[in-house]
Amino acid sequence: MKKKPQWHKLDNAAKIFPANTDKRDTKVFRFSCELYEQIDPVFLQKALEKTLQKFPYYCSILKRGLFWYYIENTERKPLIHIENRYPCSPLYFPNRKSLLFDVSYYHKRINLEVHHVLSDGSGALLFLRTLVYYYILHKHSEAFLNKEIYLENTTTASEKSTDSFSKYFQKEHTSKQQKIPFAYHIKGEYFEIGQMGVIEGCISVKMLLQLSKQHQATVTEFLVAVWIYSIYEGMSVKEQKKPVVISIPVNLRNYFPSDSTRNFFKVIQIVYRFGEQKEDLETVLCSVKKQFQQKLTKEQLRKGMNALSALEHNITMKLVPLATKDYILRFANWISYQKATSCLSNVGKVKMPQEMIPYIRLFDLFVSTKTTQIATCSFEDNFVISIATALKGDLPKRFFCHLSDMGLEIEITTNIEQEC
């Protein structure tokens, strides 16, 4: 008898992604790991097969139900391949049973692309770290002979597929959320649909930390302030009437214990009004730090998480057919888009076993977007800032030039013509 496939409800954060996936914004993000040697595809395929034993949830397809989308396990097995498409190309096709992730390689880089319905950055990063771990372990088996090397990945497959939003949801009276008016939108000519510009800057972690401390700020606070100020420099006086709003995804695992590799994040909004406040970087940074202190607390995040989950648990909403929900979710996404200027995501420090560090140069990530977004991560002393953009313009140049003017040495790589 044919085994009935397992299925999972989408987590709360994932529910908005299927209805809003399109060619311009594929809802795909990419993590990459650059080694000091050329990638061997034979060992990479073996490493992927071993990794999937730890992450069976990844072998899934997205399907439509009567009331909600859902994830269903599949026997389809992924094959690694040389990179042959633009970054963050579509992975989800409504009429096709396609896997929601892809592994490719190019010279010294291993790429993992994931549709956001499957996982968030923290979950996908654990997958890539595991993949790189097995690749190095098998490729250099002689070097690790008689050595016990572990990656802190002891959770079960069941724990990895847990819906942490449902686990922590508490029904409560939700207070009124801060009203944010429509935000300023970055201007520029669009690249062709399916294309995306990527500009990456690699900086010394030590030097960036030192610069942030000089401004009495965390790295994230400092980068958000410089990004806001760089956006301001491209605004007209009339456009300054609208606020600059930066969305910051927050990893809820840092506040609510969870081993899930599915989505478990909450977005906070950092708002600055140049029409009403001073126009210098230090004032912007002061405002950014204050907002982080106010919004980045367990209580505030819990309230926001419950407010989002409440809609999912609403009886009336549950009974609305999926076709109607799609229209509702598209409208909600449009409102969200109107109220944000850009996004900055910092996934933090990437850790690997000490014995494997000599084989790895850096990790990086970037996200599909209809506008311009920043994503950052660090490995050892390499801090990589990746700017993904659907728009032609000099905003990335202004941002990196500000950092360079402050004394940071930056190694720039890009797939578009952009110089600093």
Language-model features: where?
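Short, well-ordered alpha-helical segments in soluble proteins
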Residues: 131, 135-139, 231, 292, ...
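Tryptophan-centered motif/residue detector
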Residues: 70-71, 101, 135, 165
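Conserved catalytic core of two-metal-ion nucleotidyltransferases
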Residues: 69-72, 151-152
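Acyl-thioester-dependent acyl-group transfer interface
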Residues: 1-68, 75-102, 233-420
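Non-catalytic, low-complexity flexible loops and terminal extensions
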Residues: 1-14, 32, 109, 118-126, ...
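Alpha-helical scaffolds flanking conserved acidic
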Residues: 110, 219-220, 241-244
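Short acidic, glycine/Ser/Thr-rich loop/turn "cap" segments at secondary-structure junctions
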Residues: 107-117, 271
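Acyl activation and transfer enzymes in specialized metabolism, enriched
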Residues: 36-52, 113-129, 198-236, 385-388, ...
